[in-house]
Each structure stands twice: as structure tokens, then as C-alpha cells.
Design a protein with these regions (language model features):
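Conserved S-adenosyl-L-methionine
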Residues: 77-172
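Non-catalytic, mostly N-terminal accessory regions of nucleic-acid modification and defense proteins
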Residues: 1-96, 160-170
Length: 172
């Protein structure tokens, strides 16, 4: 993905910064990008991301994929089941406009539970608050990529996920 790593961001487009940042530390293990291109084309043809029902279905599929990709216990990585993240978020009860930080966000499970907890967003002001409310840090490249994608699928235009180690001396 060298083209994505070297994406020109001189025009200030935040989405280009996101894509460039995501692929900065990611290695391409594919022998050919043809299958990836076919998958992207098929998704573009079949999934209407504006239709709420289709988007919800795609989000559910993506969440299921994330769960399956977790390497339970390997290298200290654990998938927190959605009922657990939902329960914890419910007990913390964050309000829209408060800053929520997950310093080891993995694929973004706690953050998406937080977004769902906020409920329906009705105004432009609420939408702008939502964009600033959920924040995360993730050290590893693949979970970082998945968290960014997960938040984009949950209507966060420019996810506030930083690719950094929360246990580094700078943050302790």
C-alpha cells in the first residue's frame, strides 16, 4: 500500500491524512491487490451506505468480523464482548459533549458502545459534539486500522484515534 502511505496531503484534506496515517505502519501481505479491488467493487455495487438498514447490517457484519479476528490472549490482546462494553458504558453513563478516552482502544469496541449509548443525534450541534466526544489510542497497526474503520462506519467523520502507546513514558 505504498501509494496510500505516500498520499499527497498538501491540500489539507483530513480524510487523506487519516488514510495516510492508517497505512503508515501497515505492511501489505497480499500477493496481489486484484482480489481486494474486486471486493471493494462488489461492496460499492451491493451496499448502499446511505440507507440506514443496509448500513446497520454492514456494521453488524463488521463487528462480527472484528470479533473473529481477535487473537484471544495472544500478545496480551483480548476482545471485550459487546455486552460487557455496553454494560460498562451504561454504568459510566457518559453524556454527549463529554470527552471519552479509551487509551488501549483495540478495534474500538468501547468507543462504538459509547456512540450507541449517546443515542440518536438530532441536530448539527449534537453531531459536532459527537465528533469530538470519542477518542482512543492504539499502539498496534492492525487494531488501529480496524478502530479507524469502525468509527467511520459509526458516523465519525474524522476519528480521534491516535496511533500511539498509552504506556509510553510520555503519557504515564
Amino acid at each position: 500500500f505504498h501509494t496510500l502511505k505516500d498520499l499527497d496531503t498538501s491540500d489539507g484534506d483530513m480524510r487523506k491524512f487519516i488514510v495516510k496515517g492508517i497505512f503508515e505502519d501497515t505492511n501489505n501481505y497480499m500477493k496481489s491487490g486484484i482480489n481486494l479491488r474486486k471486493l471493494i467493487n462488489k461492496m460499492n455495487d451491493k451496499v448502499d451506505f446511505i440507507d440506514a438498514t443496509q448500513k446497520h447490517t454492514f456494521n453488524d457484519l463488521y463487528e462480527g468480523m472484528l470479533k473473529d479476528l481477535q487473537s484471544a490472549g495472544k500478545a496480551g490482546e483480548f476482545y471485550t464482548p459487546r455486552p460487557v462494553t455496553n454494560f460498562i458504558v451504561e454504568k459510566v453513563n457518559p453524556k454527549l459533549g463529554e470527552i471519552v478516552l479509551d487509551p488501549a482502544c483495540g478495534t474500538g469496541g468501547f468507543l462504538t458502545s459509547t456512540i450507541n449509548h449517546f443515542g440518536k443525534i438530532n441536530t448539527v450541534e449534537e453531531y459536532e459534539l459527537l465528533q469530538k466526544s470519542v477518542n482512543g489510542w492504539e499502539k498496534k497497526p492492525l487494531p488501529y486500522l480496524l478502530a479507524m474503520t469502525n468509527l467511520i462506519l459509526h458516523d465519525i467523520e474524522v476519528p480521534q484515534i491516535k496511533h500511539q502507546n498509552s504506556l509510553a513514558r510520555l503519557y504515564c
